[in-house]
Amino acid sequence: MSSSNNQPNFAPFRDEKNNSLVVILGAQWGDEGKGKIVDLLASQADIVCRCQGGNNAGHTVVANGKTYHFHLLPSGIIQSNCTSVIGNGVVIHLPGLFAEIEAIEKNGVQDCWSKLKISDRAHLVFDFHQEADGLLELEKGDSKIGTTKKGIGPAYSTKASRVGLRVCDLMGDFEDFTKKFKNLVKGYRKRFSELEVDVEKELERYKRYADIIRPSIEDTVFFLSEELKKGNKNIIVEGANAVMLDLDFGTYPYVTSSSCGIGGVCTGLGLPPSTIRNVVGICKAYITRVGAGDFPTFLDSDIGTKLQDIGQEFGTTTGRRRRCGWLDIVVLDYVNRISGLTSIAVTKLDVMDTFEEVKIGTAYIHNGQKLKSFPADHSILSEVEVEYITMPGWKQNISLCRKFSDLPENAQAYILKIEELSGIPVQFVGVGKSRDATIRRF
């Protein structure tokens, strides 16, 4: 917890080979500002990795006066001396990757392909996966989950069914790839009669893709293992989506299709658990959720709309408006139990600069009883009442604060209360969009 000068007693861990491996995870329902914290740390990183998800993720980084939008690429790609790794747990839509690299390079980032390593074990997302994603959502009617329609669920489904196509298939015998691709399309057409796929055109396109991406394809498990053996490596793992969207631990079925917690780091990159020591959970000073699903502290009021407007809460991937609510300590505690957070970053504190008072959700009440843990059952979660504490706002602009002591007393008290309630030291405080608008406490 905090020492007398409000500085937590915390020393960044380095292993016996003097490596530093830091994992950045979303500690809410996504859109917490993970990209900004990764970008802040990436200036000193040797390697930045993505371990799961696909281009359903959306990370925004504001650096050097420019805004960058990431979906598949690790945010570290904008650093000139940093290697970016797309791990085996990621599902890759190659047309989306090509478009993203083109946009990033137009924004001034050079040599993306030469800085990128793509796992040969990663599975591919095809256009028909995306079309099927939309059709599945239509079938659900009123029970739709709010998918991004990027084909992520169908791609992970084919992976689990052991009929998916991997990057190594594309790099191998193209006749064999063709046969597998046609069989996969045939299976999808049986399920979705309205599915339209120009098989020959798609195969021609993927043959071109294969030639372009070949130099970037690597056994990333071996690569990362060898880099750790060398020692003195700074490695960042950039989690996508968020722990509350995790397939196993999230608010099922309103979740994504991958493991978004610490387990997904190990399975999505082939990293032994013993290599991980620093796990930074990213949370907004309030909380947001895009798409359907339970949201206990949701503010269906002018206050929620105010957070939405000031915070510019629109999805990077879909453009949908995000629902907003008060910070939820029950969620943060649950995420910590799953992922073992060593610290947290509280972003967008400045969004609440004009509020007379701010609240923090501290407990869930169901049928008059305080719940001891986060409920798995949707029917229970949808009925909980939230117990809040109320704190005075700070009513002043904090966007130029660069030290914790620069913050107004009430803003400091809010951060320290989050520390007290969660039991997790707050390492970073975000007070604006840009990289430098961040207070680092340790």
UniProtKB/Swiss-Prot annotation:
Function: Plays an important role in the de novo pathway and in the salvage pathway of purine nucleotide biosynthesis. Catalyzes the first committed step in the biosynthesis of AMP from IMP.
Name of the featured protein: Adenylosuccinate synthetase
Family: Belongs to the adenylosuccinate synthetase family.
CDD domains reported in the protein's UniProt record: AdSS
Residues that bind substrate: T316, T317, T318, G319, R320, R321, R322
Entry binding sites for Mg(2+): D31, G58
PANTHER family attached to this UniProt entry: ADENYLOSUCCINATE SYNTHETASE (PTHR11846:SF0)
Gene Ontology CC terms: cytoplasm
Record flagged with keyword Magnesium: yes
Binding-site positions, IMP: D31, E32, G33, K34, N56, A57, G58, H59, T148, R162, N241, T256, R320
Cofactor(s) this protein requires: Mg(2+)
Subunit structure: Homodimer.
Pathway: Purine metabolism; AMP biosynthesis via de novo pathway; AMP from IMP: step 1/2
Keywords assigned by UniProt, alphabetized: Cytoplasm, GTP-binding, Ligase, Magnesium, Metal-binding, Nucleotide-binding, Purine biosynthesis
